[in-house]
Amino acid sequence: MWSQVYDPFNNIWLSTMAAAIPVVVMLAALAFFHIKAHIAALMGLVSALVVAIVGFTMPTDTALSAALYGAAYGLFPIGWIILNVIFLYQLTDRKGQFKILRESIAGISGDRRLQLLLIAFSFGAFFEGAGGFGTPVAVTGAMLIGLGFAPLAASGLSLIANTAPVAYGALGTPIIALAGVTGLDMLELSGMVGRQLPLFSLIVPFWLVWAFCGFRGMIAIWPAVLVAGAAFAIPQYLISNFHGPWLVDVGAAVSSMVCLTLFLKIWKPKSIMTSANGKFDGGNQSGASVGGGHNYSRKEVMTAWTPWLILSVIVLLWGIPEWKKALDGISLIKIEWSHLHNMVQKMPPVAAVPKIEEAIFKLNWLSATGTGIFIASVISAFLMGYRIREMLAVYWETFKLLKYSLMTIAAMLALGYCTRYSGVDSTLGLAFANTGVLYPFFGTLLGWLGVALTGSDTASNVLFGGLQKTSAEQLGLNPVLMAAANSSGGVMGKMIDAQSIVVASTATKWYGHEGEILRYVFFHSIALAALVGILVTLQAYVHPFTLLVH
């Protein structure tokens, strides 16, 4: 068994710089050298293996096994989700159903800003709550590009929108995992996050529209933006504090969709933005002259929406713990990963006591969200009149379309698992933990870093939750506050994690432009994370914000 070493150079800053090499290599390759994503990911993976084996003294076979374990996880369940979401999109697009759906959304409003709120923010939050793990970005990115948004806008905006709901994604999985790894009360953690994120659920819709069309365009529709945000934030606070983490996103998303749709029946902006570039360039008409209508019958519209309604119902069903448990009971295959399972030991101060790391690959082929999406796709295909041979042809074309994306995701997860099991992630985390009185701010950024590295708020909570609790207790801070801050800060890192960026580029048919997407969203990510850090610092030290911590 190998024990992790967090300061192999006996100098925390040298060790931290070494630990940062894999991430810097991959992000620099993407953002500055315009190298294709799958090549950049492989470069990052090679550098991670070198740092782990040479710098952090991880056994070679263990490091390689960790990378293979991550690659397997990248393909299943994450790649499996993306493959089947795009399969459904291709099925609907070939039959002309997506065109009808697109125009029916324009029927609610022809304004691009309002379409963005409905799809990326409200509808996307529903998929985050029901499925998580890349589902919302894949679905909303595909829908936005189908509506005529530019690829960069569709990719970047779907990523920015997928922030506020992330902490309660997949029916509360990040909070449940955080409670498990810290030993803190799950309902207390749920409530604490619910006293941090609702403010950002109000801010993000404004931020989203501002990112698309600027301040002037955002202010012009502020009543609708406020309705979308408030209708999400209020249920988010109430459900998280008085019920638990399970239905926060689903309830808040449905509330936001319904309230915004009803509001748009009685309110119209003075000028309708119909241009796809987010500018008032003549592609706009007065609100009085444009109602956003279409020429399709109600039956045709319902037929076009049916595949996505089936998808919503099945993804929600697949997220219910009891249903998932029942499916796992007849299908789950657990594989103890050779040369890795119980071969690595996490050490203090990252863990309170030495802790042996498991590595069990769960092949939950029936209960996986991607399988639910596949079933929804097949049902929808039959309803649209596809024959089995036609379905198989579309599926093969979808696979060929996504082959490099799947390769990229596998390589990125291989990198992430290599840094996780080698302790490289934890070295970066400890650098944040050594910030003393500023720890509430930098501890929040630690959550942001965790999600940026792992691609998952759940994984970040598992990785750094124990460290947050231990550091908070040593500094005299409330451990519930800092554990919750890890999750709340983490949501802002979701838009820059390489896995999500590849999902977005794939969904918008813009693979190979990941560097441009990263540059587009990076400022938004770090700025929002800093704002969360400021709020957590106020909650730690400044009255009356301290009253929110109990």
Predicted segments, located by residue:
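Active-site loops and adjacent core secondary-structure elements that bind or stabilize anionic groups
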Residues: Y237-I333
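Transmembrane helical segments that form the transport core of multi-pass membrane transport proteins
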Residues: N295-L446
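Hydrophobic mid-bilayer segments of alpha-helices in multi-pass membrane transport proteins
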Residues: A18-L27, A37-F56, G79-V85, V225, ...
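Juxtamembrane helix-boundary/capping and inter-helix hinge elements in multi-pass membrane proteins
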Residues: D93-F98, G110-D111, L144-A153, G180-L187, ...
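Structural signature of hydrophobic alpha-helical transmembrane segments
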Residues: D7-I21, G74-I78, G131-P136, E188-L202, ...
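Juxtamembrane and boundary regions of transmembrane helices in multi-pass small-molecule transporters
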Residues: A167, L171-K279, S488-H550
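Membrane-embedded alpha-helical segments and adjacent helix-loop junctions characteristic
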Residues: S65-Y73, I78-L147, G385-S471
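Alpha-helical transmembrane segments of multi-pass membrane proteins
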Residues: R113-A125, P151-A164, L187-P205, A211, ...
